[in-house]
Each structure stands twice: as structure tokens, then as C-alpha cells.
Amino acid sequence: MGAAAAEADRTLFVGNLETKVTEELLFELFHQAGPVIKVKIPKDKDGKPKQFAFVNFKHEVSVPYAMNLLNGIKLYGRPIKIQFRSGSSHAPQDVSLSYPQHHVGNSSPTSTSPSRYERTMDNMTSSAQIIQRSFSSPENFQRQAVMNSALRQMSYGGKFGSSPLDQSGFSPSVQSHSHSFNQSSSSQWRQGTPSSQRKVRMNSYPYLADRHYSREQRYTDHGSDHHYRGKRDDFFYEDRNHDDWSHDYDNRRDSSRDGKWRSSRH
């Protein structure tokens, strides 16, 4: 390494100087970073100082330290710009180290963020298509209407007895009308659906869910259950009375026939 190259490594270029800045001022300023050998402000042909200067340090380690410490400081309201002198070994090394780090730091988010955005948009598009397919079929709407009407009639009409107004606020006549309409629509739907879908619908019928209730849940509401059992017992009682009446009628008819035959014989 020659003397000129060693001197370039220990020298800084200071630009954007005010005309009032002197060599003594720069000497005192840069002496904070390390011992300074000399400071030189070049002059033009007219003898006026130029707007840049060269600061020569005694030690090479003071050069990067002075650049980090004093770069951008204002002298007479104007910030100074410190650079490595041309021919210095610090200048290409600093540029080669700082530029790839800056480039890599800025390129990595831009390279990953579009792919992440595209994956997010693809997931949103696929989910929207699935939702659209599930709700766009008219059979799903008709099936939902039939299931809702059957569930309402089984829960309020059959289990809790007949009432003038159920909890939904409709009268029995309106319910019967809606029930007939739902039966017609369900029969049309049953004709158009294959046997596999019909089995799925029979398995998902609402009244099958009542079989899974526990014994405690089944007997919690004593009033409604008692009323339901009373109506069921009345039906069996009427059925038994009807069977007894028919049996008595048959016996009387047979006895009358026997009497007629006996009267005709005698």
C-alpha cells in the first residue's frame, strides 16, 4: 500500500459548506472523532474559499467514526455532507455491504406479499363459490320450507295438543292451509327426487330427533306429557268401546237370527 492510498484512507471529503466556515472551525469539529492532522479548504482563482474541504486524520479508524458522528450536522444553518475520499478503500466496501442488505431487505417483502395475497384471494373465491352452490339450488329452499313446517307442526301441534293459537301466532286454519300446501309441494319434490335423496330426507326427518331425548328431559314437562297421555288413553278407550259395541251387536244379531230360525221351525 502506497503513501497516497494510506492518506486517502485517512481522509474525508466534507461538502455543502457555508462560505463563513473556516479551517479552524472544521478542525475543532472533527477533532471530536479523533486526532486531526490537517484541514484544507480549496480556493478558486479569485481566492474565495470553495464549498468543500478535506479533513486528514491521524488514525484510519477515526474516518468511519467521524462520518457516523458528524454527517448532516448544520454549520451556519447548512447541513454538511461527509463522504469517503475517492481512492479510499472504505468507499467501495461500504457501498457493496450496504447496498445488498438494503436490496434484500426491500425485495423479500415484495416477493412474499403478492403470493400471500393471491392465496388469500383464492381461498375467498373458493369459499364464495361453495356458498353460492349451496344456496342457489331451488330444491334446497323447498326442502328447508318443508322441514320447517313439519318441525313446527310436530312440536306444537302433536306434542303439546291443539290450541287456538300456537307460539308462532297462526290460527289452526292457516296451519292446515300451510300444511296442505307443504304436503303438495313435498309430494312434487318426492316425485322428482331419486331414492337415495329420499332416504337421506327420511333419516333427517325432525320427529326422529325426539327419540334421542333422555328420560329426564322426556318427563320434565308433566303437564304437557299428562295431557298427551290423556288424549292417547281416551283414544284407546274409545277404540275399546267401539270393539265392545261391535261385539255386542254381532252377538245380538246372531241371537236374533237364531230366534228367527227357531220361530220359523215351530
Swiss-Prot record:
It comes from the Eukaryota. This is RNA-binding protein 7. Changing F13A: Decreases affinity for RNA binding. Does not affect The NEXT complex assembly. Impairs snRNA binding. RNA-binding subunit of the trimeric nuclear exosome targeting (NEXT) complex, a complex that functions as an RNA exosome cofactor that directs a subset of non-coding short-lived RNAs for exosomal degradation. NEXT is involved in surveillance and turnover of aberrant transcripts and non-coding RNAs. Binds preferentially polyuridine sequences and associates with newly synthesized RNAs, including pre-mRNAs and short-lived exosome substrates such as promoter upstream transcripts (PROMPTs), enhancer RNAs (eRNAs), and 3'-extended products from small nuclear RNAs (snRNAs). One of its GO terms (molecular function) is RNA binding. Residues 10-87 form the RRM domain. The RRM domain mediates RNA binding; the RNA must have four nucleotides for efficient binding. Mediates the interaction of NEXT complex with promoter upstream transcripts (PROMPTs) and potentially aberrant forms of other non coding RNAs, such as snRNAs. The RRM domain exhibits specificity for polyuridine sequences. Pfam families: RRM_1. The modification Phosphoserine is found at S136, S137, S204. Residues 25-35, 59-76 are annotated as: ZCCHC8 binding. Residues 209-266 have a biased composition (Basic and acidic residues). Residues 90-118, 162-266 are annotated as: Disordered. SUPFAM superfamilies: RNA-binding domain, RBD. Ubiquitous. Residues 90-115 have a biased composition (Polar residues). The modification N-acetylglycine is found at G2. Component of the nuclear exosome targeting (NEXT) complex composed of MTREX, ZCCHC8, and RBM7 that directs a subset of non-coding short-lived RNAs for exosomal degradation. Interacts with ZCCHC8 and SF3B2/SAP145. Binds to MTREX through ZCCHC8. Interacts with YWHAE and YWHAZ; these interactions are stress-dependent and RBM7 phosphorylation dependent; release RNA from the NEXT complex and may affect RNA targeting to the nuclear RNA exosomome for degradation. GO terms for cellular component: nucleoplasm; nucleus. The modification Omega-N-methylarginine is found at R152. Phosphorylated at Ser-136 by MAPK14/p38-alpha-activated MAPKAPK2/MK2; this phosphorylation is stress-dependent; this phosphorylation decreases its RNA-binding capacity therefore affecting RNA nuclear exosome-mediated degradation. This phosphorylation mediates YWHAE and YWHAZ interactions. It is found in: Nucleus, Nucleoplasm; Nucleus. Changing L25E: Impaired interaction with ZCCHC8. The lineage of its organism: Eukaryota, Metazoa, Chordata, Craniata, Vertebrata. GO terms for biological process: meiotic cell cycle; regulation of alternative mRNA splicing, via spliceosome; snRNA catabolic process. Keywords: Acetylation, Meiosis, Methylation, Nucleus, Phosphoprotein, RNA-binding. The keyword rRNA-binding does not apply. Changing F52A: Decreases affinity for RNA binding. Abrogates the interaction with 7SK small nuclear RNA (7SK). Does not affect interaction between HEXIM1, CDK9 and 7SK small nuclear RNA (7SK). Does not affect interaction with MEPCE and LARP7.
